[in-house]
Amino acid sequence: MTGKLGPDALATALAATGAADPAVAQGPAYGEDAAAIDLSDAGETLVVAADPLSLAAESVGTLAVHVACNDVAASGADPRWLTHTLFLPDDDPDRLRTVAEQVDATAEALGVAVVGGHTEVLDALDRPLCSMTAMGTTDRFVSSGGAEPGDRLLLTKGAAIEATAILATDFREECLEAGVPAATLDAAAGFLDEVSVVPDAAAVRDAATALHDPTEGGVATALVEMAAASGAAFAVERDAVPVRPETRACCDALGVDPLATFGSGALLAAVPPDRVDDALGALDAAGIEGAEIGVVEAAESDGDAGSAEGDAEPGTVRIDGEALAEPPRDELYPLWEARE
C-alpha cells in the first residue's frame, strides 16, 4: 500500500547506517528529514536531505525541488546545491522537457544550483519519478528533535497548502463535480507558488529549538514525528491550526482532512515562550502568516501512558485532547488509488 512506512518497519531501514563516522552530527532517525555533517575546518555544518516525488503529475519537477530544499531549510541551512535523479516511463521528449524546465525554473528561483544527477527510462513506471538530494551549510543546525517542555508550537501559512494545489490541478474535474467554484480552484492552484518554506525557516530559525516541515500525512504526521524525535508530547488545538478557505473547500468536497494530507508550504516550529513574539514578528516582517497552535509537554521516561498532562508516552500528540493512535496515512492516496 502506497505511503510512508510505519515507525516499526522504518526502524529496519534506519538501523542500516554503514561505517561509523565521527563527523556525522545527525544521522538517520525517526522524525529527522536531514543529515548533518560536521565540517569542523570550515566552522560549518553540511546539511543533506533526499526526497522522491511521483504522484503530483502536473507539477512533479517543481514539487520535487521544493520538498528537498524545504528539508534543508527546516534544518537551519540555506539550500545551495541539488542533485537530480529522474526516472521516466518512456522517452517522450515533451515529458522530459516539461520536468526539466520545472526543475530548472524552481531551482533558479530559490538560488539553488543543480550540480548533477541521473536520467533514464524505466518502463515499469506509469509516471515520472523525481528523486532530489539537496545540500546547504549552516553555522547552527536545527533538528526536529530539539523541542523542550514548555515550548510553544507555531505553524506558518496553514495546513494542506501542497494538497490544495494538487486537488485543484490533478483533481480539478472531481472538485468541480462536487461543487467547488472554478474561481476557487484557480486560486487554489496558485498555492503551488507557496510550497517553499525557505523564507519561513530563515525568519524563525534563530528563535526555534526545533523545526519540521509537514509533507506526506500533513500537519498531524509532522506533529507526531517532531514529538517522537524530541522525546516529548504535544497538545494542539485543531481550531488554532490555520486552514484557508480554498483548502477547506477542496478538502471538504473530496472528503479529505486538511490536517492529514500533503502539507509542504507550512513550517512547524517549537519556540521558547519568551521568543514567540520574536518569531511571529519575524514572520510578519517577511510577509508570512504564523499562528500558535499548541504546546510541548513533558513525556514519561518509563513509557507508561496516562491521560493527565505530562504523563504521555514520547511522541504522543493530542488534538483537542484526543491522542492520535498513529501517524495518519495521507488522505490523498485513496483518491489516486481510485483511479487505478
Predicted regions and their residues:
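Small-aliphatic-rich amphipathic alpha-helix that forms the alpha element of a beta-alpha
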Residues: 57-82, 99-112, 199-203, 221-225
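General beta-strand structural signal in soluble alpha/beta enzymes
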Residues: 25-29, 48-49, 114-117, 155-157, ...
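Extreme N-terminal cap/leader segments of soluble proteins
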Residues: 1-56, 106-107, 111, 331-340
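Acidic, Ser/Thr/Pro-rich beta/coil linker or hinge segments at domain junctions
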Residues: 283-340
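Glycine-rich anion-binding loops of enzyme active sites
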Residues: 78-170
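Helix N-cap motif at beta-to-alpha junctions
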Residues: 270-276
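Active-site-proximal betaalpha loop/short-helix elements
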Residues: 91, 188-263
